[in-house]
């Protein structure tokens, strides 16, 4: 306490007074002191020593004891207030990243207050149903959030030993995902898309339809009130933001949704903190309120480009395509904040959306994302051009946690075998289609023609479905069997004989 009081005197602030240790109001006073100490840090000193402005960065000289990641409040000559964060410290110099941009900052007249605290965001269960900007300020004309807690936006590190392996399948109602790339609760799986493709519609459909597989009471959590969606938009246009907002309102789920919107005309630098604000809110809802949270992050390509802009302003050595060398680590600090924790009922499932520049899956953003996440859902332009919705190409798509989320007791015992056989038949069908373009249909064998028929029916009946068509995983598997009956039993080599004898002869007239 004495040390803190001395530090306050050195920094120009009033020293903290000791709290009396007796009496009925001791608990309340101690709590008030804890709150003021941790969250309402008073500015230490005000500086007018801005020596330069470079892009989103402000450089200050003659700063006493600047600290890394410290929050700085800037006051412009016209009284406008902005906030920033210390990115780099060298002696008495500090490089500050300004979240709202640096336009209008006068080097001689701008004053900077160092708060002595890190960036924290107020969190509360009341944030559900609200809309915030990319800095976490309400933009829905509602009141300021009455905070239950103030949390560091970088999150708390989770002990790997305390993580629980995701094993409960989330039913999205989309056959291409549920049947062949099943998502587990607590998984991180991105949607790899490109400009002009319906990735927003797919994400909205997942939000509308997501729920646990309805199997039996000992497996399924039937309660819907503990489900929440946190949606973070980075660099999207107003049309996309309005699409998601109106979709949530129309299906009646807006009360369970928290939106963070950084639009294309908002400051680029703000995109660095938007996903972290969203994930901090999601962690509070999951681990404190014990809700099952689905986090949608769009567009991660805009986030990575904002990261590149800051890196270029700091004159760091660029990596591939000009992106910083630490982009892999930076993306991991976002994606790894998904999962389940022992002793908590809640979970965080992440579905980041990224648009691949020039449809290039080898671009650094999708390339590094694929290394970190547990699979990907690939949205294909060729399928989209043929009017197939959702245009999900199952061949490059993958779910690494599918094996533990399906099977007897979770979905159905034939799930894995049907998925493997559908993959094999579709891959062979694609090869036959390519061969047909070279040699013509007359040169194909009878088996080849069967694969070609399967290919067309698979895309038309299995992949294609309506945007409001919600298929159960059992309906999806039945459609899969209906397609596999195109082939004689002998050609279905990926399915064990016992499974074939049980499911293959079923009457498919009801489908």
From Swiss-Prot:
Keywords tagged on the record: ATP-binding, Cell membrane, Cytoplasm, Cytoplasmic vesicle, Hydrogen ion transport, Ion transport, Membrane, Nucleotide-binding, Synapse, Transport
Which residues are noted in the entry as ATP-binding?
400
Q: Which GO terms describe its biological process?
A: ATP metabolic process; synaptic vesicle lumen acidification; vacuolar acidification
GO MF annotations for this entry?
Answer: ATP binding; proton-transporting ATPase activity, rotational mechanism
What is the topology of this protein in the membrane according to its UniProt annotation? Answer: Peripheral membrane protein
Top-level taxon of the source organism: Eukaryota
One GO cellular component this record assigns the protein to is: synaptic vesicle membrane
Which residue ranges traverse the bilayer?
A: none
Compartments, record wording:
Apical cell membrane; Melanosome; Cytoplasm; Cytoplasmic vesicle, Secretory vesicle, Synaptic vesicle membrane
Query: What family does the database annotate?
Result: Belongs to the ATPase alpha/beta chains family.
Fill in the subunit field for this protein: V-ATPase is a heteromultimeric enzyme made up of two complexes: the ATP-hydrolytic V1 complex and the proton translocation V0 complex. The V1 complex consists of three catalytic AB heterodimers that form a heterohexamer, three peripheral stalks each consisting of EG heterodimers, one central rotor including subunits D and F, and the regulatory subunits C and H. The proton translocation complex V0 consists of the proton transport subunit a, a ring of proteolipid subunits c9c'', rotary subunit d, subunits e and f, and the accessory subunits ATP6AP1/Ac45 and ATP6AP2/PRR.
Free-text function comment from the UniProt entry: Non-catalytic subunit of the V1 complex of vacuolar(H+)-ATPase (V-ATPase), a multisubunit enzyme composed of a peripheral complex (V1) that hydrolyzes ATP and a membrane integral complex (V0) that translocates protons. V-ATPase is responsible for acidifying and maintaining the pH of intracellular compartments and in some cell types, is targeted to the plasma membrane, where it is responsible for acidifying the extracellular environment.
* Alphabetical list of HAMAP family matching this protein: ATP_synth_B_arch (MF_00310)
Q: What is this protein called?
A: V-type proton ATPase subunit B, brain isoform
Taxonomic source organism: Pongo abelii
Q: Which gene encodes it?
A: ATP6V1B2
